[in-house]
Curated annotation (Swiss-Prot):
Cellular component GO terms held in the UniProt record: cytosolic large ribosomal subunit
InterPro entries: Ribosomal_bL19, Ribosomal_bL19_CS, Ribosomal_bL19_sf, Translation_prot_SH3-like_sf
Similarity comment: Belongs to the bacterial ribosomal protein bL19 family.
Role, per record: This protein is located at the 30S-50S ribosomal subunit interface and may play a role in the structure and function of the aminoacyl-tRNA binding site.
SUPFAM superfamilies: Translation proteins SH3-like domain
GO biological processes: translation
HAMAP family in alphabetical order: Ribosomal_bL19
Gene name as annotated: rplS
A Pfam family matched in the record: Ribosomal_L19
Transmembrane segments: none
Domain of life, per lineage: Bacteria
NCBIfam families: rplS_bact
Keywords assigned: Ribonucleoprotein, Ribosomal protein
Protein name: Large ribosomal subunit protein bL19
């Protein structure tokens, strides 16, 4: 393991976050800390993960897409952000691609993703 990867692994361990195993096609609920003036609250953002970037490094991120009031909304979250309160996998999707950018041009039934019923957690 090279020096940079070793430093990143130490930083990830220092954060102490537990990131669930999720991939493109999964529906996730991200609890994001929002600060409004002096108050801080957790806002949930639920949608389909259309891509992950950066593997499991400290700079990794993932893109979540949802339909809000008939408009497609995408948001990119840094995986190890201090503003992320929680990541919860709502359902597992069965897809054959790592990046689901084709969902941007689809609406309704053609944008559906089949659910995985026989998912097994990865043991580490």
């Amino acid at each position: 393991m090279n020096l940079i990867a070793q430093l990143e692994a130490e930083q990830i361990a220092a954060l102490g976050k537990t990131i669930p195993d999720f991939k493109a096609g999964d529906t996730v609920r991200v609890g994001y800390k929002v600060t409004e003036g002096t108050r801080s609250r957790v806002q949930n953002y639920e949608g389909v993960v259309i891509g992950r970037k950066g593997g499991n490094t400290i700079s990794a991120s993932f893109t979540v897409r949802k339909i809000s009031f008939g408009e497609g909304v995408e948001r990119v979250f840094p995986l190890y952000s201090t503003n992320i309160d929680s990541i919860e996998v709502v359902r597992r999707g069965r897809v054959r691609r790592a990046k689901l950018y084709y969902l941007r041009s689809r609406r309704g039934k053609s944008a559906r993703i089949a659910e995985v019923t026989n998912y097994k957690e990865k043991s580490e």
